Amino acid sequence: LKKNTDYTVKYKNNKNIGTATITVTGKGKYKGITAKATFKITLPEKQKVTVSKITYRVTNAAVNGKGTVSVKGITDKKTRTSLTIGKTVKIGGVSYKITGIDSSAFANASKLKSVTIGSNVRQIGAKAFYNCKSLAKVTVNTSKLTDKNVGANAFKGIKPTCTFKVPKAKISAYKKLFKAKGA
Protein backbone atom coordinates (compact mmCIF):
# COMPACT_ATOMS: atom_id res chain seq x y z
CA LEU A 1 0.00 0.00 0.00
CA LYS A 2 1.19 3.48 -0.89
CA LYS A 3 0.10 6.59 0.95
CA ASN A 4 -1.87 9.03 -1.25
CA THR A 5 -2.11 6.35 -3.97
CA ASP A 6 -4.02 3.61 -2.16
CA TYR A 7 -5.20 5.60 0.86
CA THR A 8 -5.30 9.03 2.50
CA VAL A 9 -4.87 9.93 6.16
CA LYS A 10 -6.66 12.80 7.86
CA TYR A 11 -6.21 14.00 11.42
CA LYS A 12 -8.66 16.09 13.42
CA ASN A 13 -7.87 17.94 16.68
CA ASN A 14 -4.45 16.31 16.94
CA LYS A 15 -2.46 19.28 18.20
CA ASN A 16 -4.16 20.31 21.44
CA ILE A 17 -4.95 18.49 24.65
CA GLY A 18 -8.09 16.40 24.31
CA THR A 19 -9.41 13.72 21.96
CA ALA A 20 -7.98 13.50 18.45
CA THR A 21 -9.31 11.54 15.47
CA ILE A 22 -7.45 9.80 12.66
CA THR A 23 -9.31 8.70 9.51
CA VAL A 24 -7.78 6.43 6.86
CA THR A 25 -9.75 6.35 3.59
CA GLY A 26 -9.10 3.89 0.77
CA LYS A 27 -8.49 5.06 -2.81
CA GLY A 28 -8.50 3.26 -6.14
CA LYS A 29 -9.11 -0.46 -5.66
CA TYR A 30 -9.49 0.22 -1.89
CA LYS A 31 -12.22 2.83 -2.41
CA GLY A 32 -15.09 2.51 0.05
CA ILE A 33 -12.91 1.27 2.90
CA THR A 34 -12.61 3.70 5.79
CA ALA A 35 -11.08 3.24 9.22
CA LYS A 36 -11.42 5.71 12.09
CA ALA A 37 -9.73 5.79 15.47
CA THR A 38 -9.50 8.24 18.34
CA PHE A 39 -6.72 8.86 20.80
CA LYS A 40 -6.13 11.14 23.77
CA ILE A 41 -3.54 13.88 23.87
CA THR A 42 -2.53 14.69 27.45
CA LEU A 43 0.16 16.60 29.25
CA PRO A 44 2.70 14.36 30.94
CA GLU A 45 2.47 14.32 34.73
CA LYS A 46 5.00 16.66 36.37
CA GLN A 47 4.97 18.78 33.18
CA LYS A 48 5.35 22.48 33.97
CA VAL A 49 3.01 24.90 32.19
CA THR A 50 2.81 28.69 32.59
CA VAL A 51 -0.53 30.47 32.16
CA SER A 52 -0.85 34.22 32.87
CA LYS A 53 2.55 34.28 34.64
CA ILE A 54 1.55 31.47 37.04
CA THR A 55 3.51 28.22 36.64
CA TYR A 56 1.61 24.99 37.26
CA ARG A 57 2.82 21.40 37.68
CA VAL A 58 0.54 18.71 36.27
CA THR A 59 -0.37 16.24 39.03
CA ASN A 60 -3.04 14.26 37.13
CA ALA A 61 -3.04 14.46 33.33
CA ALA A 62 -6.65 13.31 32.78
CA VAL A 63 -8.52 15.30 30.12
CA ASN A 64 -12.03 14.26 31.19
CA GLY A 65 -12.47 17.05 33.72
CA LYS A 66 -10.58 15.12 36.40
CA GLY A 67 -7.12 16.52 35.66
CA THR A 68 -5.32 18.37 38.45
CA VAL A 69 -2.44 20.80 38.81
CA SER A 70 -0.45 22.34 41.63
CA VAL A 71 0.87 25.91 41.59
CA LYS A 72 4.65 25.81 41.24
CA GLY A 73 5.31 29.56 41.33
CA ILE A 74 5.04 32.84 39.46
CA THR A 75 7.25 34.31 36.77
CA ASP A 76 6.94 37.87 38.13
CA LYS A 77 7.91 37.13 41.75
CA LYS A 78 9.84 40.39 42.20
CA THR A 79 6.99 42.68 41.08
CA ARG A 80 3.62 40.97 41.65
CA THR A 81 1.46 42.56 44.36
CA SER A 82 -1.66 40.38 44.24
CA LEU A 83 -2.40 36.80 43.32
CA THR A 84 -5.57 34.82 42.78
CA ILE A 85 -5.32 31.05 42.72
CA GLY A 86 -8.63 30.03 41.19
CA LYS A 87 -10.62 26.80 41.33
CA THR A 88 -9.44 25.74 37.86
CA VAL A 89 -7.07 26.74 35.07
CA LYS A 90 -7.54 26.15 31.33
CA ILE A 91 -4.55 24.58 29.62
CA GLY A 92 -4.86 23.87 25.91
CA GLY A 93 -8.64 24.24 26.11
CA VAL A 94 -8.97 21.72 28.96
CA SER A 95 -9.88 22.67 32.55
CA TYR A 96 -7.69 21.36 35.36
CA LYS A 97 -8.57 21.67 39.06
CA ILE A 98 -5.97 23.59 41.06
CA THR A 99 -5.50 21.33 44.09
CA GLY A 100 -2.19 22.42 45.58
CA ILE A 101 0.49 25.03 46.15
CA ASP A 102 4.02 23.64 45.97
CA SER A 103 6.73 24.14 48.60
CA SER A 104 8.43 27.55 48.33
CA ALA A 105 6.07 28.49 45.46
CA PHE A 106 5.99 32.18 46.45
CA ALA A 107 8.89 32.31 48.91
CA ASN A 108 10.54 35.74 48.99
CA ALA A 109 7.89 37.39 46.80
CA SER A 110 8.53 40.56 48.79
CA LYS A 111 5.96 42.80 47.05
CA LEU A 112 3.06 40.33 47.30
CA LYS A 113 0.33 42.04 49.38
CA SER A 114 -2.79 39.92 48.86
CA VAL A 115 -3.53 36.31 47.97
CA THR A 116 -6.77 34.46 47.26
CA ILE A 117 -6.68 30.67 47.52
CA GLY A 118 -9.30 28.75 45.51
CA SER A 119 -11.80 26.26 46.89
CA ASN A 120 -10.19 23.18 45.28
CA VAL A 121 -6.82 23.68 47.02
CA ARG A 122 -6.27 20.88 49.53
CA GLN A 123 -2.50 21.11 50.03
CA ILE A 124 -0.04 23.96 50.72
CA GLY A 125 3.63 23.05 50.72
CA ALA A 126 6.30 24.00 53.25
CA LYS A 127 7.47 27.61 53.01
CA ALA A 128 4.89 28.31 50.26
CA PHE A 129 4.58 31.98 51.33
CA TYR A 130 7.82 32.12 53.31
CA ASN A 131 9.26 35.60 53.75
CA CYS A 132 6.47 37.36 51.82
CA LYS A 133 7.08 40.40 54.02
CA SER A 134 4.33 42.56 52.46
CA LEU A 135 1.60 39.89 52.58
CA ALA A 136 -1.23 41.64 54.46
CA LYS A 137 -4.37 39.80 53.31
CA VAL A 138 -5.04 36.13 52.59
CA THR A 139 -8.48 34.99 51.46
CA VAL A 140 -8.93 31.24 51.83
CA ASN A 141 -11.91 29.76 49.95
CA THR A 142 -11.12 26.12 50.67
CA SER A 143 -12.29 24.08 53.65
CA LYS A 144 -9.95 21.19 52.86
CA LEU A 145 -6.79 22.26 54.72
CA THR A 146 -5.49 20.37 57.76
CA ASP A 147 -2.30 20.22 59.79
CA LYS A 148 -1.20 17.24 57.67
CA ASN A 149 -1.53 18.95 54.29
CA VAL A 150 -0.15 22.42 55.12
CA GLY A 151 3.63 22.31 55.27
CA ALA A 152 5.93 23.69 57.94
CA ASN A 153 6.53 27.45 57.86
CA ALA A 154 4.05 27.88 55.00
CA PHE A 155 3.29 31.41 56.23
CA LYS A 156 6.47 32.24 58.18
CA GLY A 157 7.84 35.72 57.60
CA ILE A 158 4.62 37.31 56.33
CA LYS A 159 3.48 40.72 57.58
CA PRO A 160 2.71 40.39 61.34
CA THR A 161 -0.63 42.19 60.86
CA CYS A 162 -1.75 39.93 58.00
CA THR A 163 -5.47 39.14 58.08
CA PHE A 164 -6.97 35.83 56.98
CA LYS A 165 -10.51 35.63 55.59
CA VAL A 166 -11.64 32.00 55.83
CA PRO A 167 -14.87 29.97 55.50
CA LYS A 168 -17.13 30.57 58.52
CA ALA A 169 -17.09 26.93 59.60
CA LYS A 170 -13.26 26.93 59.67
CA ILE A 171 -12.50 30.13 61.64
CA SER A 172 -11.33 28.40 64.81
CA ALA A 173 -9.49 25.52 63.13
CA TYR A 174 -7.74 27.73 60.56
CA LYS A 175 -6.70 30.34 63.15
CA LYS A 176 -4.87 27.60 65.03
CA LEU A 177 -3.56 25.97 61.82
CA PHE A 178 -2.12 29.12 60.23
CA LYS A 179 -0.54 30.22 63.51
CA ALA A 180 1.15 26.80 63.76
CA LYS A 181 2.42 27.23 60.19
CA GLY A 182 4.13 30.56 60.89
CA ALA A 183 1.42 33.21 60.56
What function would you assign to each model-found segment?
Residues 2-32:
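Serine/threonine-rich, repeat-prone extracellular segments and beta-strand-based repeat modules
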Residues 33-40:
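Edge beta-strands of extracellular beta-sandwich domains
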Residues 39, 62, 78-100, 109-123, ...:
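Structural signature of tandem-repeat unit edges
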Residues 41-47:
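Extracellular interdomain linker/stem segments of modular secreted and single-pass surface proteins
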Residues 50-75, 178:
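GGW-centered surface loops in extracellular recognition modules
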Residues 103-105, 125-128, 151-154:
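Consensus positions within tandem repeat domains that build extended binding/scaffold surfaces
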Residues 151-155, 172-183:
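Short, aromatic/basic amphipathic alpha-helical patches
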